[in-house]
Amino acid sequence: DFRAHGRLSYQGSRYLRFVGSGERFLKLGADAPETFLACVDFDGTVASPTKKIPLKTWRPHLEDWREGDPSWQGGKGKGIIGALNYLSDVGGNAFSFLPYNVGGDGDNIWPFVDRNDKAHYDLSKLDQWNRVFTHANQVGLMLHFKLQENEMDDHRVGHERRAAQVSGALDGGRLGWERKLYCRELVARFSHHLALQWNLGEENTQSFEEQVQMAGYIRSLDPYDHPIVLHT
């Protein structure tokens, strides 16, 4: 339980350290599935209209849910909470996930009320996500936010970085109102968690200038100065 150690932070040394206990943190956890949040138990979560990839039920981990663990709406969430318990029980201390992947491999996760509505956020879904994130920190799992993925982080595709219109890309990769709102919502709702990393994106292809602007904007918002990283 990270509440016994305090906030995890970068303090200029090789490893992240907890502000309270001073202990070093060596990240050991699952980096897949990136579609961890593509779960049938979350409100407003549906399978991709084009990818035809089924949503996760996390049913095999129902047996790992314990009395007193969170759930919602008459027992929803027990499978995904059980999956976190399992990861913690086998010695993991972190897990990663995409909060947004419209146009990406899974095309089945978004924080909005609708897949194509980047202006309005789904409050009930975000509340349910927060219950999962809270439990994760309580069982000793760091939250690794992969904020976007390779296929939809900008209007450039492939290794050749060909110009293309990517509908899911927030402001086409630039720091416009869509990207600012997205960052503000995630920071406002989730930055209070003690162990958290902001990853600008999985296999990120934004330009260096766009990466710097996005990282700088997140830094200006996050009052807890959580680490900001980049997956190249």
Predicted regions and their residues:
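Ligand-binding face of N-terminal immunoglobulin V-set domains in extracellular IgSF glycoproteins
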Residues: 1
